Amino acid sequence: MMKKKISAKKKNQQQQQLHQPTMSEVTEEERTRYEEEEDVRDSPSDSSEESEDDEEEIQKVREGFIVDDEEDEVQTKKRKSHKRKRDKERPHYDDALDDDDLELLLENSGLKRGSSSSGKFKRLKRKQIEDDEDEIESQDHQGEQQLRDIFSDDEEVEEEAAPRIMDEFDGFIEEDDFSDEDEQTRLERREQRKKKKQGPRIDTSNLSNVDRQSLSELFEVFGDGNEYDWALEAQELEDAGAIDKEEPASLDEVFEHSELKERMLTEEDNLIRIIDVPERYQMYRSALTYIDLDDEELELEKTWVANTLLKEKKAFLRDDWVEPFKQCVGQVVQFVSKENLEVPFIWNHRRDYLEYVDPDAPIPGSVRELMISEDDVWRIVKLDIEYHSLYEKRLNTEKIIDSLEIDDELVKDIKTLDSMVAIQDMHDYIQFTYSKEIRQREETQNRKHSKFALYERIRENVLYDAVKAYGITAKEFGENVQDQSSKGFEVPYRIHATDDPWESPDDMIERLIQDDEVIFRDEKTARDAVRRTFADEIFYNPKIRHEVRSTYKLYASISVAVTEKGRASIDAHSPFADIKYAINRSPADLIAKPDVLLRMLEAERLGLVVIKVETKDFANWFDCLFNCLKSDGFSDISEKWNQERQAVLRTAISRLCAVVALNTKEDLRRECERLIASKVRHGLLAKIEQAPFTPYGFDIGSKANVLALTFGKGDYDSAVVGVYIKHDGKVSRFFKSTENPSRNRETEDAFKGQLKQFFDEDETPDVVVVSGYNANTKRLHDVVYNFVSEYGISVKSEFDDGSSQLVKVIWGQDETARLYQNSERAKKEFPDKPTLVKYAISLGRYLQDPLLEYITLGDDILSLTFHEHQKLISNDLVKEVVESAFVDLVNAVGVDINESVRDSRLAQTLKYVGGLGPRKASGMLRNIAQKLGSVLTTRSQLIEYELTTRTIFINCSAALKISLNKSINVKDFEIEILDTTRIHPEDYQLAMKMAADALDMDEESELHEKGGVIKELLENDPSKLNLLNLNDFANQIYKLTHKLKFRSLQAIRLELIQGFAEIRSPFRILTNEDAFFILTGEKPQMLKNTVIPATITKVTKNHHDPYARIRGLKVVTPSLIQGTIDENAIPRDAEYVQGQVVQAVVLELYTDTFAAVLSLRREDISRAMKGGVVREYGKWDYKAEDEDIKREKAKENAKLAKTRNIQHPFYRNFNYKQAEEYLAPQNVGDYVIRPSSKGASYLTITWKVGNNLFQHLLVEERSRGRFKEYIVDGKTYEDLDQLAFQHIQVIAKNVTDMVRHPKFREGTLSVVHEWLESYTRANPKSSAYVFCYDHKSPGNFLLLFKVNVSAKVVTWHVKTEVGGYELRSSVYPNMLSLCNGFKQAVKMSSQQTKSYNTGYY
C-alpha cells in the first residue's frame, strides 16, 4: 500500500477521532459543539509542523458536503494522456476546495485519500462549451457550488427543491469525456456538426445518468437508427457544448411513454435517481407529500409509532421493558424519518440503539436485551408512512379550521387525534357543521353544490325549532356520552340535563307547518326532516363516533351467515367448511388465525356467506347511550318526547354502526393481511437464508463444483441429462445418456458405465444433485446414489492430507429451475440448449447460491408459494415482503461491486443494497463502467467520483465489497483493506484504533499514521483483538461523543478477524419429506387419511379358481406414488381388474420409498370423506347447522314421500346427485336402486360407468298376478338381482373391455379430437380412429376417425348393449368384431361414394 504524508494537524485530528463523529451523523446541536472543539483541535500540538488552516474554509467543507476520497497526487502516464485540458477554460475560484481541505474532509468521514490521484480536486462533470466566455465562467462557478450543495446536510425549503434537483442532476451524473484535440480542431468540428444537423433536436441532457443502452434499444424499436440520426446528432452536439438556444424536444415527445416507463427513462425515474433519498423510501412515499416534521411533531410521531407497535408486541414484552422499548422505537423513527437510513443500515450499524442495557447490571453494559427485531424495523418504516399520511390529513383539516376561523371546542383538540378515522370524523364534522361557510368560501371557485344543502335550509328555517325542542344538543349529548363512558355508564348523574318542551312532538310539528316560511307543509315530511336533521347532528358528532368506534374495538363480534348458494356449495371438503357456521369471533380470535377472516372475506366475495360485524350486548349498550339523551320527566309529553329521542338515536346509531362495522372489517382485513404477509416473508427467508453448499474440506461460504442430473418426467424413453457447473458458476460440461436406468437392469448398468466415463474425464464434482418432474425421479436418485457407493467416487480435501469423502448425492430444490427453464432469461443465456438442460443448469446454480437464484427470477417469483395462505393476499403485498427479505439478506451477505459490473446475474442483487433500487443501482453500475473503467478500487470513489450522494453512500457503502479481478492491473491504485470487510467507512478510524491497541502501537507511530496498522494486524495475529475490552472502549466513546458503539465494535472485531465471512446458515440438504413434496406435490401430513383415485396395476389372486378371493392389489396414484392394498382392506366378494380406477383412502405413507398403504373398505372411505372441522362451542352456530340439515332432509323427504321402500340391499332413498356421490368412490359396475321421479311404478338404477360418469336406467315395474317383472331397454327380467347380473354387469363388462382397448382415449371430446388431428398430422399417410366416452350419454361411446390427413374428423355413435356393441344398426359381440365391422363399414361407405360420384359425372 502506498504511503502518504499526513500533516501534523491531521495527526492531531486522528488523536481526537473519538471526539468527532462522521459527517454522516452530525446534527445541528452536535455541530455547534464540534465547532467549539475545533479551536482546541486546531491549536498547535507537539506533533504539529504546519500552520493553521483557514477555519472558514473548513466550516464550509463540513457544512457543504461529505467526501470519502480524493484523487491521488500522482497520475499515471496513461491517465495523464486522457486528462481533460481545461485549465485555460476556467479560472480557479477562491472558494474552491483546496487539497488540505479535501483531505481533512476525507479523514473526518472515516475514509482515506487515494495516493495515485492528483493533489488538486478534479471535477468529473463535462462542461458545456459556449461561444460566450463569460457564460462559461458563470456556469463553471455554479457547477462548483452545486458540487458542494449536493452533499449538504441542510434541507432547503420545498419551493427550492425542484430547480436544485435539476441542477444537482446536471452536475452529478453527467458523463465525462477526455480529449487531446486542441481548441482550433474542436471549433472546426463543432461547426461541421452544426451544418450537418437536421430535423428537430431531442433534449438528452437529462440522460447522462440514464441507460444509454436502453435509449439505443428504443431507437431500434422505432427504426433502424437512420430515422433518428438527428436525435443522436443532438446528443453529440450537446456533449460538445454546441446545442443552440432552441426549445429541445423531450423523450416523451419522441417515444411512447410506456416504452420509457418500461426502461425507467421517464422524468420521474430520473428524479428518483438523483434525489438523495433511498429509492425504496421514495417509492413508499410516492403517494405522499412527506413533509419534513419539526421537532415537536417528530416527538408525536415517535409516541404514535411506539404505541402502535407496543399494541402488536405487548404479549412479548415484560412490563419493565415498555419504556426502553418506546425509546428504541423513537430512535428508529429518527433514523428513518429524519436521516433516511434504510433498514439494513439501521440493523447492521445502529444495533446499539435497538437494545436495552440494564443499568443495574454488576458490570455496566454486560446485560443487554434486544428490544426491536429486524422485522420491527421494517414495520416502523411502514408506520412512518402511515403517520405521515395521518399528519397530512390532519394538516389539511387544520388549514380548513384556520381559514374558517372556527371557534369550536370540538376542534381544538385536533392535534391529539392519533388515528386516520378520528381525523376523518373531525373532517366530516367540520364539513357538516360549517357547510354553509365552506360553500360560501368555495363559491369563488364555482363549487356551489353541497351535499348538506337540506341541512342548511332546515337550520335556517322555522322547522329547526323542533330540533331545538329535543331539549339537548348533539354536542351536549356527546359530552354526556364521553363522561358516562369514561365511568363505565355507572354514575346516575349527567353533565347536561335534557329539558322537555310544553307541547307534544305532534302538536309542535302541526304548529310549525302553519308558518308561512316553513319549507315542508306536509306533517309527515316535516317530522321526518326534523328527525333526520337531529340524527345527522348526532351522526357527525366526533365524540359519539369515538364512543361507537371504541365499543366496536373492544366488543366487536364477527359472525357468518351462509347464503343459499353457500349452503349448497360448501361441503366438508370446501376450503370454507370451517367457517360455514362461524359466529361470535372476536378481533383477537381472528388476529390469532388471520387466514380465517381472509377466507371469510373471500367467501363473501364469492357470494357464499355474509359477514356480520356487531357489538356484544347491543341492547344494553344502546340503553346506556339513551340514558344520556332522554329526559327524566314522567308526564305524557315527556314520554312522547323520549320516544321521539329514542327513534332519532336508533337511526343515528344504526347508521354509525354500519359505518364502523365496515371500518372494523377493513381494519381487521389489513391487519390479517399484514400477518399473512409476515409469514410469507419468513417462508422466503427460510429458503434464502442458507449459504451455498459447502464442499468437503472447505469453509462455509465456499462454492462447490456441481453435477446436476435429471431425466424430466422419467418415462422409459426419457434420456438422462446432466450439467457440470464449476465453482465460479461457469457451465463447463454436459452429460447425456439415452440408457434410462429405470427401464431395466441392462440399461441401468449401461448408464452407470457412461456416468463413470464422464467422471473419469475431468475433475470429480463435489456434489451430485438430482431432481425431476415427478416421483419417477426417485429411481434415478437411487441409481446414482448406489453408483457413487459402488465405484467409491470420492472428493479430496482442499488440504493435501490424504483425507477424502464420498461425493454426496442429494435431492435438489427445483422450484426455481421449473420457472427458469422456460423463461426469456434462459433463452437468452442458452439459446441452443433444450429445456431440460436449462432446468438442470438452474438446479445446479441453486446449490451455489440459493439467494441469487431466487433473486434472478424477477417477478416470476410471485408464482411460487412460501405460505399456504399466500393466495389470500395481493401480489403487490407479496412483492413488497419478498423485496424486504431480499434486502435483508443481500445487505447481510454483501455484494461484490466489481463482479456485479462484469456479471449481469450478480448485478441483479445490487438493487437490494441499502439506499439503492433498480434505478440507482443501474446508474451506479453504468457510472463505474464509464468513469472508472469498470473497476471501483475503493468505496471512497463513490463520493469522489460523484457516483452516489451523501445519504445513499451512508446506506450502501458497507454492503459493497471491493475485490479486484486478478487480471486487472492495480499497481496504480491504493487499496483500502477495510473496503474488503463489512465495516462501515464511518467506523474506519475505530477499526484502526482497535488494531493499534491490539498491537500495542502508539498512535503517533508512522505505521498507524499511514493506515498500515490494519495490514500489520492481519499479517500478525488478528486474534489479538479478542483481548480488547470492548465494553470499556464503548463507554469511552460514549463519554466523548455520546454515541453508542458497543455492537459496532463487536462487528468490527469480527470483520477484522474473519473478513466478510459467510453469516448465513449452512446449506439445508433436503429430507425425504421435502423430496416427496417436490416430486409429488403432496404434503405427507395432509395426504394421509384422504380419499384419492388409484389405478390398479396388479391383481394378486388364484386366477385358476373362479371363486378365489383377491389377496392383494398393486396401485399407482396420479402423483405416481406406488401403493399396496392388503386383503383385509378389500371388500369381500369384490372383483377388480388391472387398469381399473378405484377410490381408495391412504392409511400409511412412506416418504423414503414413495410408497403408500391404502384401503378400499367403505367404512374407511366414509370416515375419510367426513372431514375434520373443529366446532368450538359458542363460536359455531349449531342451531343454524341443524336447521339446514333438517331443511335438506325435508326437501328430500318431500320428493320421496310417494315412493315405496323396496326390500333390496342396494336400494337407497337417493336422488340422482346423492347416488352419484355415493357411487363416486365405488368401482365401475357398482350400482344403487333408487326411487324414480316418474312415479310409483318406476325405479331408477344408477350405475358407475367411469370416473364422474354414471348411467341412470329407467326400470318399469309390472305385476303379473303374484309375480313381478322388471323391464329395461325392452328386455324383461324376473327380479332385480337378475336384472343387475344379466343386464348391468354384462354392460359394465363391455364398458370395461372398451376402456381397456388400445384404441380408447380418455378425456373430453375436444381433447380426443385434438389428439386425432395431431396424430394424423404426424402420420399423414395413415388413417386413424379412436374410441372415447360419450359424456352426453354415459354408458355409450363415440368413434372418431379420419381417413387421411386432409379429411375431416367423422364421429359415429357406439351403443353398449347386453349383446355387445351397436354401430350403425349392426351389433358386434366384442371389440375385435366391432373394429373389423367398423373398417368394413368405412370401406363400403367409401365405395358407395365413388359410385355415386361416377354416376353423377
Swiss-Prot record:
Record keywords, A-Z: Chromosome, Nucleus, SH2 domain, Transcription
Covalent S-S links between cysteines: none
Comp. bias (Basic residues): 1-12, 77-87
SUPFAM superfamilies: Ribonuclease H-like, RuvA domain 2-like, SH2 domain, Tex N-terminal region-like
Region (Disordered): 1-209
One cellular component term from this protein's GO annotations in UniProt: pericentric heterochromatin
Example GO BP: positive regulation of filamentous growth of a population of unicellular organisms in response to biotic stimulus
Keyword Ion transport: no
Annotated Low complexity bias: 105-119
Major place of residence: nucleus
Keyword Transcription: yes
Recorded family membership: Belongs to the SPT6 family.
Function: Histone H3-H4 chaperone that plays a role in maintenance of chromatin structure during RNA polymerase II transcription elongation thereby repressing transcription initiation from cryptic promoters. Mediates the reassembly of nucleosomes onto the promoters of at least a selected set of genes during repression; the nucleosome reassembly is essential for transcriptional repression. Essential for viability.
Name the UniProt record assigns to this protein: Transcription elongation factor SPT6
Gene name as annotated: SPT6
